[in-house]
UniProtKB/Swiss-Prot annotation:
GO terms for molecular function: 4 iron, 4 sulfur cluster binding; metal ion binding; rRNA (adenine(2503)-C2-)-methyltransferase activity; rRNA binding; tRNA (adenine(37)-C2)-methyltransferase activity; tRNA binding. Specifically methylates position 2 of adenine 2503 in 23S rRNA and position 2 of adenine 37 in tRNAs. m2A2503 modification seems to play a crucial role in the proofreading step occurring at the peptidyl transferase center and thus would serve to optimize ribosomal fidelity. [4Fe-4S] cluster binds at C146, C150, C153. The gene is rlmN. This is Dual-specificity RNA methyltransferase RlmN. It holds the Pfam family Radical_SAM. It is found in: Cytoplasm. GO terms for cellular component: cytoplasm. It comes from Sinorhizobium medicae (strain WSM419) (Ensifer medicae).
Length: 413
């Protein structure tokens, strides 16, 4: 896919989109990302009578998560005095869109900017929308940067700056629904590739920047709100949390959140996984597999997804495939084989396609679904393992080298 296939929307283009209020006063606490009981406490503190607070919370909740408003003045069934009080003390603003890119395959990537909140300067993260036939998946970030330093992952080369708040995690979903026309009274961008019917965002995956389970409480709150039946109403079976293997929090995820689980596996031996996914030194494969087997509600209809990036001459032999089948014995599982997505400066290469197919065939014959993930958004660095904030990338990456690499990969997808 050539660089010409990529469309970058600048600030002028963004201004033409449905207008949402930006965070001009970040010092105000946001009502987004609060559980009902926490929102109720704040409203009572600001003078809302106890006898009214349940009704007021329900009203605000509906406007935030069903109607998708970003301005208190749009809450038409809330009294003027109440709206003025809310505006004076709180915000429901969206993050700033620094840049929006649209890949030739319809994948969209947003670079979003949030307030510093202890980081010393505003921070930026990336959120990616992947349209497919009959579904649209939003890939959400949980941290600014990452601590895990997985050797094949571009995000891992950006040091952790801070965790995202529950508000900032949810804001990615709210903003994407704004931009895609997935709220009432919002228009879908002309020419956008989205599902023909129903919701534009049908699935959410916590597979963006960061390790979600190192930000457990904020991720938990955000996902419980996203799956609330009176709001955004995403089924927990359509929310997938991907982890590199933080074993104690895997148990907590099953008990306290209950969404689908994905494991960034990538190797079947501890020595190799120690190198590819260094958290394995703390939580080795035996402990990780025990946590997976104990995950609540597992069945053939509710499987754990194991992600396995295909690295040439590293982890792609048939012997690796045999060991993978042994490792997953007794776990209802699907194995996503991911052709390695190149990024500037990496020493890894993608496995040959013929080898990937042989690997997949062996796993299929052993009884496991093993789809080969179609690379999406490579031309805008939106594919798996490529996310990294633009401000960080531009300081370290030679743009000409990147463009030369992408031209060399033309036609691969």
């Amino acid at each position: 896919m050539s660089m010409a296939a990529t469309e970058t929307l600048n600030r002028t283009d963004i201004a033409k989109a449905p207008q949402v209020r930006l965070a001009a006063q970040p010092e105000k606490p946001s009502l987004i990302g609060l559980l009902r009981e926490d929102m109720a406490k704040l409203l009572v503190e600001k003078g809302v009578p106890e006898r009214q607070v349940k009704m007021r919370v329900s009203q605000v909740w509906h406007w935030l998560y069903v109607r998708g408003v970003s301005d208190f003045n749009e809450m038409s069934n809330v009294s003027k005095d109440m709206r003025e009080m809310l505006s004076a003390h709180f915000t429901i603003a969206r993050p700033e869109i620094v840049e929006e890119q649209v890949s030739g395959d319809g994948t969209r990537k947003w670079l979003l900017r949030f307030p510093p909140r202890g980081a010393g300067r505003p921070v930026e993260i990336e959120t990616v929308y992947i349209p497919e036939e009959g579904r649209g998946t939003l890939c959400i970030s949980s941290q600014v940067g990452c601590t895990l330093t997985c050797s094949f992952c571009h995000t891992g080369t950006q040091k952790l700056v801070r965790n995202l708040t529950a508000e900032e995690i949810l804001a990615q979903l709210l903003l994407a629904r704004d931009r895609l026309g997935d709220f009432p009274d919002r228009d879908t961008p002309q020419g956008a590739i989205v599902p023909a019917e129903g919701r534009k965002i049908t699935n959410v995956v916590m597979m963006g920047m960061g390790e979600p389970l190192y930000n457990f409480e904020n991720v938990k709150t955000a996902l419980l709100i996203a799956s609330d039946g009176d709001g955004l109403s995403l089924s927990k079976r359509r929310i997938t949390l991907s982890t590199s293997g933080i074993v104690p929090e895997i148990y907590r995820t099953g008990e306290e959140i209950g969404v689908m689980l994905a494991i960034s596996l990538h190797a079947v031996r501890d020595d190799l996984r120690d190198m590819l996914v260094p958290i394995n030194k703390k939580y080795p494969l035996k402990e990780l597999m025990e946590a997976c087997r104990a995950y609540p509600g597992l069945s053939n209809a509710r499987r754990i997804t194991f992600e396995y990036v295909m690295l040439k001459d590293v982890n792609d032999s048939l012997e690796d495939a045999k060991e993978l089948v042994k490792l997953l014995k007794g776990i209802p599982a699907k194995i996503n084989l991911i052709p390695f997505n190149p990024w500037p400066g990496t020493n890894y290469q993608c496995s040959d396609w013929e080898q990937i197919e042989k690997f997949a065939d062996f796993i299929n014959q052993a009884g496991y679904a093993s789809p080969i993930r179609t690379p999406r958004g490579r031309d805008i660095l939106a594919a798996c393992g490529q996310l990294k904030s633009d401000s960080e990338r531009m300081r370290k990456v030679d743009r000409l080298a990147f463009e030369a690499m992408m031209i060399a990969n033309h036609g691969e997808d």
